[in-house]
């Protein structure tokens, strides 16, 4: 009976995926309650943390709500936007690269 030999090669050039900031933009129509709901539902924040982030969005005009790999950030942005539109809110979300 022969024995198979396993050869392990190091992976060269593997990089971390680029990280992107998900930014909520304040508007005069999307309710604070709806924003809090999206932060809890889509980003798993507690209600208290979501409320604090929502206050920042309201006060500063925008706020970073998460930093995630590009594909995940893009999908979250799409999901939240679709949810907002289906509830007749104009919530705007943008993605920006996280600079290191």
Question: What kind of region is each of these model predictions?
Answer:
Residues 2-100:
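Terminal domain-initiation and capping elements
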């Amino acid at each position: 009976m022969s024995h198979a030999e396993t050869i392990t090669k190091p992976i060269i050039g593997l990089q971390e995926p680029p990280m992107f900031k998900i930014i909520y933009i304040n508007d005069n129509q999307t309710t604070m309650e709806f924003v809090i709901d999206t932060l809890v539902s889509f980003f798993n924040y507690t209600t208290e943390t979501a409320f604090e982030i929502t206050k920042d969005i309201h006060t500063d005009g925008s706020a970073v709500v998460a930093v995630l790999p590009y594909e995940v950030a893009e999908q979250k942005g799409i999901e939240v936007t679709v949810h907002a539109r289906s509830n007749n809110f104009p919530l705007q979300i943008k993605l920006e690269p996280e600079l290191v």
